[in-house]
Amino acid sequence: MLSNFYIEDHVRMALKEDIGFGDITTENLAEDTDFLKGELNTRCDGILCGIEVFKAVYKILSDDVKIKFYFKDGDAIKKGDKIADIEGPAKALLMGERVSLNYIQRMSGIATETHKYQLAIGDNKAKIVDTRKTTPNFRAFEKYSVKTGGGALHRFNLSDCAMIKDNHIRLAGSLTKAVEKLRKNISHAHKIEVECDTLDQVKEAVNVGADIIMLDNMPLETMKEACKIIDGKAVVEASGNVTLDTAKNIAECGVDIISSSAIVAKAPTLDLALDM
């Protein structure tokens, strides 16, 4: 999902932002002949994510940096684990330290939070999915992290899937008119999702042939009734008031996917350290 050229372009921008016109500390203290060795260690349990991005930081800074990882993306790591060994020119290691950690800590944090939500759902068929509430220009990395943590992905951007919300319904005149107009104007390859907050809207969405029906902020009993109405005629998405405590109860209503911005927006960074 993350191509090498996409990673490299993004990392170059991050390094440019952080190094600026030069690392005045490192460049005035370290000689070109100075080499360092270090370890990437974890100070807490979690799911590792972002290895290739971490490597890309140092690949850009120097061809002489060597990194050996002992885990792969998606692996569970425990407090005290040595994740990787790294060695190379001191200038490259010191200038890349913060940027490399920013990526791998953030991505591992999201993967870890996603994994917690999927575990909370239990053996139910539902999958936790992300939303478009992401960090600007970091969405691809955050979505990759969700996938790595065991979640599924919602639309990447506005061109992936048509999603009809309340404002669109008001604009079109009715839910039915909105779906019918989209069916006429968009590609057959695009699915249409409708956001519903009442059972009447659910019935209308089923009758007009919506591909995906989102149950927005519905009480559990209403959600169960909505799933009975839909009865396999559309993919059922639950959204709103999703927490680690409520995820299983929502899943047991019979929905197919549970969307939550929390797995990205509220995910804490994973405490990883580069010890040299």
Language model feature labels by segment:
Residues 2-197, 201-208, 212, 224-229, ...:
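Acidic/glycine-rich phosphate/pyrophosphate-binding loops and surrounding catalytic core
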